[in-house]
Amino acid sequence: ADLSMAVRIVDNAKTSAPEAVNSIESVLVHRDRAAEFLPKMKQALDLHGVRILGCPDTCRILPGASPAAAEDWNEDFRGYTLAVRVVDSLEEACAHMESHCGGVAVGIVTNDIAAAQRFAGMADAAAVFVNASTRFLDGGEFGLGAELGVAGQKLHVRGPIGLHALTTMKYIVTGSGQIR
C-alpha cells in the first residue's frame, strides 16, 4: 500500500470529526508493513493529541502507546483515542472486525486489487471503503440527502414487512486516497 496515502486516510478518518459515527475507532496493520507504517501514522496523529491503545506488537513499535484492554477493541471512543492492532493476514483482520466492528463502516488501504475485492466481500458492514476515508459515509455524500442516522443492523423495521423492508444495502466505495 501507499503508506503516505494510508497515513492521510487514517488521519482524516480519525481527526476530522472524531465524535462522528463515521470516524474510525481502530486500525489493523499487516505485520509486514507495521514497523514502517505505525511510526508515520503516530507522527500525524500526535499533531492532534490522539491517544493510541495497542496490542503488544503495536506497543513495541510505538513508544508511548498504551496497552489495549480486551474491551478497547469493542469501544466506540468518539474522541481522540484509537485502538491499533498488528495482524498477520487479511483473514485475521476480517475475523477481528467480525468480532469487534459495529457493522457501519470499514476500510482498507491497499494496492492489491484482489485483496481489496476479497476484503469487500468478507467485510460485514453497511459501507466498505477501499483507499478512501470512512468519513464519506454520509447520506449527503452518497446522494441520499440528509440522514436521520446510520444503521449497522441488517433488519431495522417494525410493523408490516414488505420485500423492500427485507433488503439491506452494502455500499462499496473505491478511491485513490480521497479524504473528506
Where are these regions (language model features)?
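Conserved C-terminal structural/oligomerization subdomain of aldehyde/semialdehyde dehydrogenase
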Residues: A69-R180
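ALDH superfamily catalytic-core signature
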Residues: A1-R78, V130
